[in-house]
Amino acid sequence: MLHEVTGDILLSKANAIAHGVSPNDHFNQGLALSLREQWPSMYKDFRHFEKQATPAPGGIWAWMGYGGQRVISLFTQEPGIGHGDHAGKASLSHVGHALKALSHFVVEERISSLALPRLATGVGGLAWKDVHPLVTQHLGNLEIPVLIYTTYVKSKQADESTASA
């Protein structure tokens, strides 16, 4: 069940937050930076994973913090070419594959609610009108609340009450 909300995704009560990055992302801009600042150990764990696994666009990486919060990184963007390079742009193909993987993960791990931004539209460079149908296709039939933070308002708790399962 998809629900569009307005607010600060970092204040979400959802069981997991999903966001788009590149496979070798530095988490130094956009939502990724905010997540890195809120959960520094997540970024350290991502760095370790990225060096061990060589992730590819279209995949996902999930992290669970000490307090039970989950962050799921969707590899929607091309990796940077060299060490220290900025991530490439997102593609609809990568977004689709990552959302499909996310959908399977949510079911397998029994995630009870999910929050995500307008995926791949900031740093990723895609238009929401093109990404939204993919979100609907891959997440619309999940039997959990899927909160899409369509408008960011810093420090504002979104009204998630209409999204109860």
Features from the language model and the residues they span:
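Macrodomain-like recognition of ADP-ribose-binding/processing modules
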Residues: M1-A165
